[in-house]
Amino acid sequence: MKSVNHLVLTPGSLSLAQLREISRHKLTLELAPEAINDINISAQIVQKVLDEGRTVYGINTGFGLLANTKIAPEDLQLLQRSIVLSHAAGTGQYMQDATVRLMMVLKINSLSRGFSGIRLEVINFLISLVNAEVYPCVPEKGSVGASGDLAPLAHMCLPLLGEGEMSYQGQIISAAEGLEIAGLKPIDLAAKEGLALLNGTQASTALALEGLFHAEDLFAASSVIGAMSVEAAMGSRSPFDPRIHAARGQKGQIDSAMVFRYLLGEESEISLSHANCEKVQDPYSLRCQPQVLGACLTQIRQAAEVLATEANGVTDNPLVFQDTGDIISGGNFHAEPVAMAADNLAIAIAELGAIAERRIALLIDSSLSKLPPFLVKNGGVNSGFMIAQVTAAALASENKTYAHPASVDSLPTSANQEDHVSMATFAARRLRDMSENTRGVLAIELLAAAQGLDFRAPLTPSKAVAQAKAELREVVAYYDKDRYFAPDIEAATDLLYTASFNAYLPLGVLPSL
């Protein structure tokens, strides 16, 4: 990358760090010059098929169950237009511009590999839309994640035909207006181009990548806030001893324990104050954090590997092979790897919230934490964090339902030609809602743990924990008596949305950071 906001794309080489940037920041894009030759050769192979009068699926045939129907040469251009229009059958709210931007870059990356038989001018059209920050309006629902994300990608490609709606600077405009802003005119798609644009897993992958980056942020926040709860509850540092975790050998657990040691430091005034207490063991929500968060970290890392591969792969069909000139039909559009990665991320996100909710319950329970009941003075007159914990329980419980695997829920489509599908798009899309729920739980724990630390004063926590608490206190004051609670949760949630707690972790723990 030349800078944060300009990317010279060498097809097939996007890093997770670059993908995170693309998902969260606007950028300008240009294609590396060395990619152009592969694109042109691939398109020439498709043209050769037409010149020789051969019949090849996806070039001069129908699609799906109609694959055996040969299309007359004079109808090929109409075929490409028709497939885009007919497949733009999505429903629901529009995806966020950032999601569409990431999806477009993923599609550009795939098409530019030279396996798709698509002309350079079509790829440059998509690049121009990204650079002009004019994004197609893409409904969230309508893909089952096999034969690609057909409906979402069709909506993404409508502007090439001058059809559909677009988003520009927060406003919904017509495709005609959007193309004028970008300095473009509609183009006629050539043979295979409509299918190449629509086939692929880019919608599912974009949504899953966003879920991955949220999961990374939540892991970092869980670690920082979990360490704060250890200090607030006067928990032991012994469970983070590296010898314990080395004996088991689980890499995620070992690294999570290392993060807790990094955050808690050697000792603090709080930890020294109870070094010789009679308590033998802490509850699991404190003591087993490396085991639980470490397992989540393992799932995050595995999903990251799958999604980084998918982001750089070619997932349309059929594929053009330049070395032999062969055009071969396969099934790379089937998004099962994305669906399973998203399912695993869903479990990790749910568990980060579930154990955080238990730590909140621990902190407000005076018999366990030795803090004032519900973390407030003058209990009875004040209810303190009583209902905030109920809110956390509601959010954590909702995620349990969301965490049901989507990849096992297949329905046949296209008259049973497409008889097993991945449901990757929903598997990935729900990660946003799950992340919002877990972020809400962590925001409440952050408020509770900071409140607990205030009750421990003048004893001080570790340096990192004190710094994190200070960040919160810049936006939320100490809870001295009952007040309107929702704004406090909102402010703490907004703080977590900044992902500032990512900086508290050592480099290399999370895949994209």
Swiss-Prot record:
Crosslink (5-imidazolinone (Ala-Gly)) position: 146-148
Keywords of this entry: Cytoplasm, Histidine metabolism, Lyase
Compartments, record wording: Cytoplasm
GO cellular component, one term: cytoplasm
Known catalytic reactions: L-histidine = trans-urocanate + NH4(+)
Record pathway: Amino-acid degradation; L-histidine degradation into L-glutamate; N-formimidoyl-L-glutamate from L-histidine: step 1/3
2,3-didehydroalanine (Ser) PTM positions: 147
Enzyme class: lyase
A Pfam family reported for this protein in Swiss-Prot or TrEMBL: Lyase_aromatic
GO annotation, biological process: L-histidine catabolic process; L-histidine catabolic process to glutamate and formamide; L-histidine catabolic process to glutamate and formate
GO MF annotations, alphabetized: histidine ammonia-lyase activity
Principal location class: cytoplasm
EC number(s) given by UniProt: 4.3.1.3
PTM (free text): Contains an active site 4-methylidene-imidazol-5-one (MIO), which is formed autocatalytically by cyclization and dehydration of residues Ala-Ser-Gly.
NCBIfam families per record: hutH (TIGR01225), PRK09367.1 (NF006871)
Family note: Belongs to the PAL/histidase family.
Protein name: Histidine ammonia-lyase
Annotated source species: Shewanella oneidensis (strain ATCC 700550 / JCM 31522 / CIP 106686 / LMG 19005 / NCIMB 14063 / MR-1)
Phylogenetic placement of the source organism: Bacteria, Pseudomonadati, Pseudomonadota, Gammaproteobacteria, Alteromonadales
